[in-house]
Amino acid sequence: MRPAALLLLPSLLALLAHGLSSEAPITGEGHATGIRETDGELTAAPTPEQSDRGVHFVTTAPTLKLLNHHPLLEEFLQEGLEREEAPQPALPFQPDSPTHFTPSPLPRLTNQDNRPVFTSPTPAVAAAPTQPHSREKPWNLESKPPELSITSSLPPGPSMAVPTLLPEDRPSTTPPSQAWTPTQEGPGDMDRPWVPEVMSKTTGLGVEGTIATSTASGDDEETTTTIITTTVTTVQPPGPCSWNFSGPEGSLDSPTAPSSPSDVGLDCFYYISVYPGYGVEIKVENISLQEGETITVEGLGGPDPLPLANQSFLLRGQVIRSPTHQAALRFQSLPLPAGPGTFHFRYQAYLLSCHFPRRPAYGDVTVTSLHPGGSAHFHCATGYQLKGARFLTCLNATQPFWDSQEPVCIAACGGVIRNATTGRIVSPGFPGNYSNNLTCHWLLEAPESQRLHLHFEKVSLAEDDDRLIIRNGNNVEAPPVYDSYEVEYLPIEGLLSSGRHFFVEFSTDSSGAAAGMALRYEAFQQGHCYEPFVKYGNFSSSAPSYPVGTTVEFSCDPGYTLEQGSIIIECVDLHDPQWNETEPACRAVCSGEITDSAGVVLSPNWPEPYGRGQDCIWGVHVEEDKRIMLDIRVLRIGSGDVLTFYDGDDLTARVLGQYSGPRGHFKLFTSMADVTIQFQSDPGTSALGYQQGFVIHFFEVPRNDTCPELPEIPNGWKNPSQPELVHGTVVTYQCYPGYQVVGSSILMCQWDLSWSEDLPSCQRVTSCHDPGDVEHSRRLISSPKFPVGATVQYVCDQGFVLTGSAILTCHDRQAGSPKWSDRAPKCLLEQFKPCHGLSAPENGARSPEKRLHPAGATIHFSCAPGYVLKGQASIKCVPGHPSHWSDPPPICRAASLDGFYNGRSLDVAKAPAASSALDAAHLAAAIFLPLVAMVLLVGGVYLYFSRFQGKSPLQLPRTHPRPYNRITVESAFDNPTYETGSLSFAGDERI
């Protein structure tokens, strides 16, 4: 028995080990046998008890890198970088970027149309979809494909999914009888998200193992364990074609058609998730779908999916934006041969923003930025106080939001205002009605050595016991300067304090209500007048501090008329400075004639309520060749009140429109240059509410003989040749720097009142202009359209030197069109040094005789008679650095007489054509120059004898005697010799 027990001991230990592993008890270190810890998260391997659990979501994409993230995101980004730099666990697969579709916790997309998100996992797919491109760099994980050992034969079926186990999860002992069997439903939770493996159409699935037999003999039992190797070959149907994207930008490409025909089309999902605080922008680069194919785009991350677009609205160049950081695209194609269609989308993350904060009533808001980190600053109008946060900050989230609610501006009931310079006091609820049972006290205190002036903007109290008291002091005991109980009319000039203080009391009873009061205060120095004020108007002054002698001129806002005062007032009286006239008032009056080209018509007493039983008429007149556009911006009148517009200058003209009761914004156009407006209020009732009435803006516009108004174009502007778009008007469109006009930039208004061309657009310039050719060169271009990054290289012809940059590169600019890196070069004639002149050979000559000869010049040599030229008769200055002569200079050698003549004849016969003309010239000069000299000598001798000796040396003897002429006494004779009567000769004294 003892040997038998020893033989059974290994089998019992193996069974015990398998039982412990199947129950997965937690060890002392906190790890279960079937659980592996990865990056701080526990992920469980599939077990039979967990086969129906959802797949655990684990992303394998690297941490999102945002190129231009907000500073508030640095914490999250740094955390992501640290997680990225941490050593990654060795995984049993190598994902691409983006990976094939993995189950994702994105809401509302796990099940659509009651169909599974992806088909049953199979180890074979009919066709591998085209892998989209992304900027994310895939992880380089290397791991040996695991081997799977199973303990039972595989069940029959068309396909199956085989889980991949980690090496440490492989059973090292004989598996128990309850081994996990692959099923059609696919694995449950695993160490990583399950990814369908892409295989060929016909796949041989081999599960290899070793056959081992262990036998234990005993009295009553025998155990045998066998490992079987099985190979299954299956033909798979089309599988899923879906991906997850988590980068800041990437591409979505349509899947390729299956390699074999199928009765089922593709059903593909593309899930995009970017960093929270960013939205997803998808641009349609190209799309071509078959009839019946569908594409839907939805925004995710909210309580419900947000439909964004479908195949009916997806056109090339269209941009779709998801207001959340997640988006999904679903593509359903037709089976072959009809489908699938093709598409190519690009997506990128864009920064989301907070909504523009609501402007408080009786206040305003200024915003630095609507993006996370931006702030909004609220402030109230004079007389109102801010209730709530003055500053709001936009916080980053899936949908950015303000850190607090928008504040409101309220009119406080009482308060102390110290160092009061200029401001307002309004009753609670103003300009609406105040409430009952109020008791409000305000104390106004001016700066040192200054006084206060109070101006009554409005006082409207109920006729019961409501009361307003203003005291000339700082407490309730000070003497009153105004009491609504005792004064029926308001002081137009206002109130002046004798010191630094005013004390204001406002009280209401339990019944009745009205608009209340609005008081304006201003402090002024001793020896100066107070700052004047006109409601619904403006003024200009000659001095900012209003000393004595200051003049002030008033004007009213459009629609108001100056009343009850002078347009110009002056500060007078040095001892007690004061204005010589009270400030005027600007009011919206009933009726009037207006001849301006643009203006405003207001209901009587606007924005205060108009009176009952009024009948007002306004006449508006513009130039004769124009018409009037009426822009009715506010129309809130009673149902018994009537507002009528007449297309002419009296009440007999055609009625343009007649209105009663409230109405929204609308416009009217007249056909003439005049319009008459009539307002009749119901005598029985009156409007008591604030801003009850109407506001009408009018403008002078051209008649109906004009072309339609042309709109502005994005990234550009228009410039018409004249304001009226009549026939012949030319409108020129231009684009901002960095953009160019696409289409005709010049449009003309034609006879039929239509424009000659379609509206152009401004398109971003993505290429440089042609830099042009350079004379005496050729160029090499990298792209014929010269896009950004293109280069142009210039190469000069032989004999020319390039000046400038030989290579030009097209660079992009943020504030303008792309520009070349440099100007186009020039090819200049290459300059060479001259050759030094050569001396003439002995007994010879050279031509020309110069000290320096330019490159390319030629020297000719010749010898004297009786000498023979040995060498080249002509040599050339060869260009170079330095330049040099083509041959050495020749020499002249003496020759015999016979040889001279023979050699000379031979030389002349062999003389090159280029030197024969020169030698002939030399020969002619040698012959004719002596001849010319001899002729000149003979001519000179002849002239000498003919003029100075009185006879010609060439005179010949005559054949007959010359005639004799007697000399008469009367003839003139001036010979001195004959006058003296003597003739002397050399050597004789007397004859």
Swiss-Prot record:
Glycosylated. Residues 1-19 form the signal peptide. Disruption phenotype: Mice show reduced exploratory behavior and motor coordination, altered maze performance, and poorer memory retention. Molecular, morphological, and electrophysiological evidence of defects in dendritic arbor patterning was also seen. Secreted and membrane-bound isoforms in null mutants exerted opposite actions. The secreted isoform showed an increased neurite number, while, the membrane-bound isoform displayed a decrease in dendritic arborization. Embryos were viable, fertile and normal in other respects. One of its GO terms (biological process) is regulation of dendrite development. Residues 241-353, 413-524, 590-701 form the CUB domain. Residues 352-411, 527-588, 705-764, 766-829, 833-894 form the Sushi domain. It comes from the Eukaryota. Keywords: Cell membrane, Cell projection, Cytoplasm, Disulfide bond, Glycoprotein, Membrane, Repeat, Secreted, Signal, Sushi, Synapse, Transmembrane, Transmembrane helix. It holds the Pfam family Sushi. Belongs to the SEZ6 family. May play a role in cell-cell recognition and in neuronal membrane signaling. Seems to be important for the achievement of the necessary balance between dendrite elongation and branching during the elaboration of a complex dendritic arbor. Involved in the development of appropriate excitatory synaptic connectivity. This is Seizure protein 6. The lineage of its organism: Eukaryota, Metazoa, Chordata, Craniata, Vertebrata.
